[in-house]
């Protein structure tokens, strides 16, 4: 017979995710988890946000949670080895690892870590994220951090890739001003609300990205109770920064770039000061279609 703990999922309705080890709690830093539709620019957003925090004098750790391991590419100027790579190299004997084996200093002192992931179709990405946090704790990297940014794979919100939500105090959703990314943002918001029943994480809001206007996002916000925290337009300099292996703070100065840099600094300041948690009500799929899908 199942006991009571088996009958009552600890992590939201129907969840099978295990409860986080209390020893892995990130005590002192402000922790943010960045989600959004695949290809929407989460890594670019995360890296420039980390750079902005560092510009404010904060000690920042960015953790990439995607098997592509390109989250910190513009910060480090290269694809760094992943935690899963270095663990495999030492046959998972963590005592053989040094900090420099999996933590790399990037632009303006941002400490960069790529969790990586298991081979396609095998294992659980959440396990890899958990092992990454465990290693960082063992080597006291997180104790010295002011800010931790989790850059999370696509719009996957299964128990595994929702693992960063166990550590975060605010979850942010990157979305463009179009139906597909808003649809994904709504699903992500629903998953975050489910996690909020048992964890400290709360919705922070939407970061509008690659968008000239935000009218569709604002329509969604008005209906769901979400809000827009920042707006980054669809500029060629942002695309080129990725090709140049650079953050936006390293690109050739221009008036339009200066405006984007200031928006990142404003967002970092707002997040550091603390944004009020949202009590949004995600829409059902039909409501999204009715709201945005048929004009």
Swiss-Prot record:
Q: Which residues are noted in the entry as ATP-binding?
A: 39-44, 68, 209-210, 233-235
Q: How is the cofactor bound?
A: Binds 1 [4Fe-4S] cluster per dimer.
Function in brief: Component of the dark-operative protochlorophyllide reductase (DPOR) that uses Mg-ATP and reduced ferredoxin to reduce ring D of protochlorophyllide (Pchlide) to form chlorophyllide a (Chlide). This reaction is light-independent. The L component serves as a unique electron donor to the NB-component of the complex, and binds Mg-ATP.
Chain residues that bind [4Fe-4S] cluster: 124, 158
Its required cofactor(s), as named, are:
[4Fe-4S] cluster
Mention one GO biological process in which this protein takes part, according to its record: photosynthesis, dark reaction
**Family annotation (InterPro entries):** NifH/chlL_CS (IPR030655), NifH/frxC (IPR000392), P-loop_NTPase (IPR027417), Protochlorophyllide_ATP-bd (IPR005971)
Pathway assignment: Porphyrin-containing compound metabolism; bacteriochlorophyll biosynthesis (light-independent)
Task: Name the family the entry cites.
Answer: Belongs to the NifH/BchL/ChlL family.
> Reaction(s) catalyzed by this protein?
chlorophyllide a + oxidized 2[4Fe-4S]-[ferredoxin] + 2 ADP + 2 phosphate = protochlorophyllide a + reduced 2[4Fe-4S]-[ferredoxin] + 2 ATP + 2 H2O
- Which Pfam families does the record associate with it? Fer4_NifH
Residues noted as binding Mg(2+) in the record, renumbered to the chain: 43
Q: Which organism is it from?
A: Rhodospirillum rubrum (strain ATCC 11170 / ATH 1.1.1 / DSM 467 / LMG 4362 / NCIMB 8255 / S1)
Q: Which domain of life is it from?
A: Bacteria
Organism lineage string = Bacteria, Pseudomonadati, Pseudomonadota, Alphaproteobacteria, Rhodospirillales
> So what EC number does this one have?
1.3.7.7
Principal EC category: oxidoreductase
Protein's name according to its UniProt entry: Light-independent protochlorophyllide reductase iron-sulfur ATP-binding protein
Sorted alphabetically, the keyword list is: 4Fe-4S, ATP-binding, Bacteriochlorophyll biosynthesis, Chlorophyll biosynthesis, Iron, Iron-sulfur, Magnesium, Metal-binding, Nucleotide-binding, Oxidoreductase, Photosynthesis
Record's subunit section? Homodimer. Protochlorophyllide reductase is composed of three subunits; BchL, BchN and BchB.
PANTHER family assigned to the protein according to its UniProt record, in alphabetical order: LIGHT-INDEPENDENT PROTOCHLOROPHYLLIDE REDUCTASE IRON-SULFUR ATP-BINDING PROTEIN
Q: Which GO terms describe its molecular function?
A: 4 iron, 4 sulfur cluster binding; ATP binding; metal ion binding; oxidoreductase activity, acting on iron-sulfur proteins as donors; oxidoreductase activity, acting on the CH-CH group of donors, iron-sulfur protein as acceptor
